[in-house]
Amino acid sequence: TVMLMTSPIVEENLNKKVIPQYTYARIYFKNSILEEHIDRPECEISVTISLGGEYDNLWPICIKDYEDNTNCIKLDRGDAMIYYGRDLKHWRNKFNGVSQYQIFSHYVYADGKYKDRLFDGRKNIGLP
């Protein structure tokens, strides 16, 4: 899966071992808004990957850094952003295109508080 394939990239960028949690895909449609939020505690590290869609302009994801500065990042098809989803508020303003396809993968630190949460506590990947 995408989550397993991107684990080494996340580890290389963070210089730390991670444990995969879960992945999901989402399709956003015209006028969609992703409200400002933080992810649940077990989402220590998050990755969002743009799969493209039907739009004239890239739809930025906005994130507040640890000093409360807002940064809005435009991801083109195939681009990814690694971020601390449980720590940093993130959102997307109104989408003006037709559709936007996105994959989200979440990880925890292999030596952290949630190290026993492989696959979000499931016995196998992809099973409830």
What are these regions (language model features)?
Residues 1-24, 36-38:
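Signature of the catalytic double-stranded beta-helix
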Residues 127-128:
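Low-complexity, Gly/Ser/Thr/Pro-rich intrinsically disordered linker/tail segments
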Residues 12-18, 53-56, 96-98:
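Secondary-structure boundary elements
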Residues 30-87, 91, 99-103, 110-124:
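Catalytic core of non-heme Fe(II) oxygenases with the double-stranded beta-helix
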Residues 27:
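Conserved active-site beta-strand element of glycosyltransferases/polysaccharide synthases
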